[in-house]
Amino acid sequence: MKFKEEKKELKEIITAFERDYDVYKNKNSLFNEQMTRQQYIDRFLRLLGWDISNPRNLSFNNREIVAEEYSNSSDRPDYTIRMNGSSLFYVEAKKVSVNIESEIDPAMQVRRYGWNGGHKISVLTNFEYLAIYTTFHQPKEDDKVAYNRYKIYSYKEFVEKFDEIYELLSRESVLNGYFNEWTNNITPVNATKLSLDQVFLDQLNEWRLLVAKDLVASSVSEFQDSSTLNESVQSFLNQLIFLRFIEDNRFEGTEQLKNKINKHTDYQSYFKSLDKKYNSGIFENPDVILNMNGKTLKIIVESLYFPNASYDFSVIDLSILSRIYENFLQEEIVFDNKYIVKLEKTKSAKIKAVVSTPDSIVKLMVQRTLGEKIEGLSPDQIMDLKIGDLAVGSGIFLIEAYNYLENYLVDWYSTKEGVVATPYSVPFKVKKTIVQKVFRGFDINNQAVQLTKFSLLLRLLSYEDKERIIEISPLLPSLEDTIICGNSLVDERDVDITTMSYEESEDIVPMVNQVFDTIKFDVIIGNPPYLQTKEIIESTSNIEINVYKTKYSSVYKQYDKYFMFIERALELIKKDGITILLVPNKFFTVGAAMKLREFITKKYGLTFIIDFKTTQVFHGVINYVAIVQFGNYSDKTFQYSVAVSVDSAFEIENGLIYDMTKLETSHWFLTQDIKLRNQYEFAMEHFPNIETAVVPVNGIQTSANNVFLIEKKYIVEETKENIIFEVNKKKRIERFSIEKSLLKDFYQTPPKVQGRSYMPLIANKYVIFPYKNGKIIDYNTMEDKYPNTLEYFTNHKQDILPKVMGGKRDVQYCVEWYQYGRTQFLKESNVDKIIVGVMTNQPNFNIDRKRMLIASGGTAGYIALMKKEDSPYSLEYIQAWLSHSFTDMIFQTIGSSFEGDFYTHGTSMYEDIPLLPIDFSDSYQKEKYDKIVSCVKKIEEINQQIESGLNSKELKFREKQKNAHISNINEIFDELIQFKVENKSE
């Protein structure tokens, strides 16, 4: 029987419970919550796999269940269930005499905990009952006790329904993924709109407009400056949230802020006393509150309290608050006219929205790095560390780094003093010193800098007790010299301050020289901005871009901004320092990152890579990323692993070991498959690369496909000289004629049709090709010989007119207004070639004997492989080799990966693709070669038969026949590869 031992023990617990049930239920019973937890709830949780006694001796960082001390009077959940450092749900305990099945207060309390914690469920129990509540919805004053109650079990059902309870709440359920599955299933689609994140963000945005309107209407001229206005409003909101935070954490009296507002306190004196007590600059400036309408102030303050809101700032995780503020910073207050304000996306957000780094990723990165760095260190040694984030944003990485250090010190002090491990084990002065001395954060956005300071100070006070810190003055440290507004990529010495305008200075925000001159980091951690070259040009001044080009070797071709952050971070770490970043994984392979790869391999090092490949880790945004740990090491080896989920990444201990000296700069060939890696290294050492036989080229680029391409289905008439087609233009049909001699077949698979090797190539479109021998046909010749086409072009002149002639189209080397945007692939179309699908999820190499045109564009479209005249290898052999599974695995490894298991086959990759060589003087190899070529030709014949039209039975037979030939080809290649390995062919 499943759970036989667990059910046996549970029966014993229930028998003991029933024996004294009447005593427990008495309202005057001395059997309190502590006893209920110790005798019943702790034991029940243990049967579900959650053991608060920590039998595996996990560090405080890694504990999976954290219980509040029985004697602790703080208003926090009794149990926090965690996995990989992230809290999953709370369990709130009550003494047996509390009727949790019918009393509203316990239900409201546990729902508030869950909602403020960002959880999907919370559990309430007095052992007599166990109730599961959904917590995606903010509790309201008039809610009934059963509202959002998903399940409730009586203790009399515990044994009978143990399997069900175990499936829902056990440690095993969390580990095997079922917990996530069932909680996701019961959470409504619109839950994000009801979550703390969205509700609080909406209120912050509402409040900041209310405050801004008051300030603009005041007589203070400074508030007419949008930058000052935004910073002042944020500072004021920080003040209010800080006050609510210290109330809920019992450093100040309950509802003190509300009472002060209702009494119309002397705010200047009030803020002065707060500033003296807490220091840190939070209450330094009372200007906003002094210039606000009292009605506005009252509206905002009352919105922070129940029943108007269910906020509990003792429970809200700072990672959630950081995430909310990160979204808050995506918009700014702007003037619609002199006295009217509105919210608008910031300049950078308009170009590319910032997406919060998932908490679990942050925890993983901190754990992987600090776990190694601080092992065995004393508090004094930890206080000598320097940990930095060069693009600090909301401060989430520094907050989590602090969490990790504090939890490490909890273990250190509790072990030293022989006491139970709790956050109170660490002296507050030590915590304060760590926040002030260890962390450094930098950001170009001053509001982000202020937010990080604010978050660190809140974290310092979290899990603290008023009595422990009552004698400390000033209570909080100043972070003015450690969390700094400045450009991590540009120092003052990089620009000429004397010639810059104020606006340029505000835009660039060059870092003060002394900041980085006087510090080297033990650890740099973060998620730097991802901005492509095009986005950098749109958002960055020419002065700053010129600094990039002269200062950073990684600025090459279509570079990305994170390239420079990698380079900068590596320059700023100590000899034994570590840099760990979450960055797009395409820098392993793309051509634009070649200089960055050179920089890393020649000057620095790698420790490990956790590659998420196509697994998406960000919410609502597609990014292909990896966690990369860099270091300035003499050891030239690193470990490479692939993670299929964030949870699985926590389980990774060792990856495949690579030697950095063997990495090519053109691409890094990284795989977990040691057999594939060994085969590839052998092939690259003993085989020629395929560019000895073919030349990869891009297809045409018209820069106006809507004009130059004609779908054949729109052709309504055809003569010996012309085609006539119709187009629907602005709700009317227009008819045009094009000379056939200017038309070429254009190959492009229809939408949702996935190309593959050995398929017939069918052109469903024509492309107008106004060229002869690679040169544009001049206007007079067009007028004389191709008047129909010229008339068509003239009719669409506004669509194809080049920029240099007053139009919109990007055209290089402009001679005639109707030429293509680029001059590529104008001559190559006159010979047989292999057409390659650039973005596919399987081999897609096909011989084109119809001399069709193709189009290329980034990671889309097609390229062509042109056979070199002096190559002894036929197109048939090359097609077959490129379609073989070994070659396909190489493309999958060095190509950029995308969702749906798609990967690229662009022109830059072929120098790293080996070609299986044939010694034509060896009869064995020549025979194998001829068989491969013969099979490919037979496949082409079958494709021609399929094109001509077959009945379903014969079509099925021919497809079967084709597959047999493909299998024969692959078997022959397998034999040839084995032959080469055994004979160590050069």
Question: Residues of each region from the PLM?
Answer:
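Charged, terminal alpha-helix-loop-beta segments
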Residues: 1-74
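Short, basic/polar, glycine-containing "phosphate-handling" surface segments that engage DNA
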Residues: 1-24, 70-73, 83-87, 93-244, ...
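SAM-dependent methyltransferase catalytic region
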Residues: 30, 36-37, 45, 53-55, ...
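Polybasic, glycine- and aromatic-enriched phosphate-binding surface used to engage nucleic acids
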Residues: 95, 102, 121, 563, ...
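Class I S-adenosyl-L-methionine
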Residues: 201, 286-377, 807, 897
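Extended, well-ordered alpha-helical scaffold/bundle regions in very large, multi-domain proteins
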Residues: 240, 244-288, 388-394, 398-401
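Polynucleotide-recognition surfaces of large bacterial nucleic-acid defense/processing enzymes
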Residues: 276-277, 281-283, 455, 482-483, ...
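Non-catalytic DNA-recognition/assembly elements of restriction-modification systems
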Residues: 392, 684, 689-691, 788, ...
